Regions:
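Basic, amphipathic "hinge/linker" alpha-helix immediately C-terminal to the N-terminal HTH DNA-binding motif
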Residues: 76-101
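Residue cluster at the C-terminal edge of the helix-turn-helix DNA-binding motif
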Residues: 67-72
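Short helix-boundary/capping micro-motifs
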Residues: 38-48
């Protein structure tokens, strides 16, 4: 592929994406953001709405992520007159904290290579 062909692609800023793997599951920024939002709003459906996804999709992502852990990341309470909801367990909170800490370390360690990549990236 020559340089002319490459200019047809959307050029993005060089970066690093962090994905963690546990059992058969992948955990990345989107799932961690969903967990964090769930903690803030206390509802899977409200978190899903704020992220622009269906309740079903959000529930699938949360359940698939949770399936890799020996303990729950969140617990739910059925709705109705007492108003249901969801909240993170200590493990869910710990996952968010550890993921964010890991990402910060990776970002700090990546500044030199990302600067180099920006300098050699096709313009």
């Amino acid at each position: 592929m020559n340089a002319k062909t490459k200019t047809n692609y959307m050029l993005k800023e060089p970066g690093v994406r962090t994905k963690l793997f546990i059992a058969d599951e992948t955990i990345g920024l989107g799932k961690v953001n969903l967990l964090e939002l769930l903690s803030e709003v206390g509802s899977i459906s409200a978190a899903a709405r704020q992220m622009g996804m269906s309740y079903r999709r959000a529930r699938f992502l949360l359940d698939s992520m949770q399936s890799g852990f020996c303990e729950p990341l969140f617990v739910t309470k059925r709705g109705g007159s007492n108003r249901g909801g969801a909240k993170l367990t200590p493990l869910g909170k710990d996952l968010i904290r550890r993921y964010r800490s890991h990402v910060n370390l990776v970002d700090k360690q990546s500044t030199e290579i990302l600067a180099w990549m920006r300098s050699v990236q096709i313009k």
